[in-house]
Amino acid sequence: MLALSPATRDGCDGASEFLDTSCGFTIINPEEEEEFPDFADHGDLLDIIDFDDIFGVAGDVLPDLEIDPEILSGDFSNHMNASSTITTTSDKTDSQGETTKGSSGKGEEVVSKRDDVAAETVTYDGDSDRKRKYSSSASSKNNRISNNEGKRKVKVDWTPELHRRFVEAVEQLGVDKAVPSRILELMGVHCLTRHNVASHLQKYRSHRKHLLAREAEAANWTRKRHIYGVDTGANLNGRTKNGWLAPAPTLGFPPPPPVAVAPPPVHHHHFRPLHVWGHPTVDQSIMPHVWPKHLPPPSTAMPNPPFWVSDSPYWHPMHNGTTPYLPTVATRFRAPPVAGIPHALPPHHTMYKPNLGFGGARPPVDLHPSKESVDAAIGDVLTRPWLPLPLGLNPPAVDGVMTELHRHGVSEVPPTASCA
């Protein structure tokens, strides 16, 4: 059985064009040599094929076609060569197929690399465009900032000389009638603008207004003090020296005593002044001569009142506390006995417990011992030299002893046992 299969290929325009024609022979039963003779023994294949049998059409129906056999034989040989080339290419070994696949993979890699390069080029182009836009926006922003800085007013440093000239111009024109343009003309300063002068004039008026208000308030207080106050300090018409009304006396209570003004402190030459941090201290050698010998003043604290000692468990004296939420009332006399209520009878004598806490009288401490006590301590040391010295006594220095001996006329001192 002879099968002819034309191969078609689609072009770019979508139309199918016949590029080549391949003829293949399929042998159904190769053992039957009678049905399929060898075509190689016969000459030309076209001479053997009967086209009338193939198409099944009578010869008188078809028109007479005169075809040059040489053309047909040449075209058919070309088609056979092309089909054999295609068949040989399709029947390559596995290794050749793998090589072809590798080559096709390389081609795909090359194509992919080209695509990547193209994409990177596009990306670079986009980045460059973005950078151009960013640079243009940054330059425009810088230009805008520079223009704004140029439009801003330069801050003026108002020196004392400049402020003095400003005040002179304002006083000449009047504080309420002064205008920035006239002040600028009178000052004659070229570095100032009308805006600078107007701002400084506003601040000057506000500050001057506050100063005038404070001066008026101080003058008002001074006037009231002179009207209602008395320089001698006496209470006149119920008013004190500072102008305030004295408190009226309460009904049923005596008037409050006048407040005594403390006299100025009297400085005596024999009292030590109060030491202030940072001032030089007084020499300690003259301290015994500075401080006079005196006793501490007696305490003015009153002792606790006596209480009755009783064995009754019903009554307990309260020493340091009182009943909460009740006023403290001093009981001077004992309450009379009531029938039915046991009362503790006082003993024949009362017990007074002195308060040894704070405020009680203590024996005076002699800060400066007398000469007799000092002589007694020295005599005790001389009689018992093996005992340690009492507190406050230090052994004399050798230089001091020698000086004292020379002062008394002793010039020669026998050597001690250690020196011998």
Curated annotation (Swiss-Prot):
Phenotypic effect of disruption: No visible phenotype. Pale-green seedlings in double mutants glk1/glk2.
Basic and acidic residues: compositionally biased ranges: 106-117
GO molecular function terms listed in the Swiss-Prot or TrEMBL record: DNA binding; DNA-binding transcription factor activity
Region (Disordered): 74-152
Compositional bias annotation for Low complexity: 135-147
Alphabetized SUPFAM superfamilies for the sequence: Homeodomain-like
Upregulating conditions: By light. Repressed by BZR2.
Tissue-by-tissue expression: Expressed in rosette and cauline leaves. Expressed at low levels in cotyledons and shoots.
Coiled coil: none
Subunit structure: Interacts with NAC92.
Miscellaneous: Plants overexpressing GLK1 have a delay in flowering under long days, show high constitutive expression of genes encoding disease defense related proteins and are resistant to the pathogen F.graminearum.
Protein name in UniProt: Transcription activator GLK1
Organism listed in the record: Arabidopsis thaliana
